[in-house]
Amino acid sequence: MGKIIVCNTKTAQNPYTFLNTKVSVYSYEELCYYLYNNMVLVGEEDLSAKLSAWIRRELDLAELADKIDALLEKHAFVQDIMVEILVYGGYYSSEEVRQFMAECQKLRTLKPYEIEKLRADGYLRYKHYIKAGAIYDEIICYLKK
């Protein structure tokens, strides 16, 4: 069963597509939802100058784009950029953002194979079976060593 995302901001004419999952988002709210629910699948290649340009051009959110650009110049962690996006428009409550940040902290304490397992699970949710299977195989090989 899907969820309804109420969009209060401008809807983009051209979507932003996340490379790993091929999921396209058309609004700030969809972007927030995707980031919040797929943190282990989001990488540096997703949160780049291309994203800030899309936010500026398609969503008319220049202030958010400027904040992302500043974080990119500082080579900030991916999680810090995601938090900036989540906080910006108030789509998630401060408590939900705190939970997100706690989950980010928890990820930093996991072993690499545990993070990879979470990534594989994420790909499985998106029916990217080959990618998920390859990661699961790598984990099994790693654990057998």
Model-derived features: positions:
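Long, contiguous interaction/recruitment modules in multidomain scaffold/adaptor proteins
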Residues: 1-112
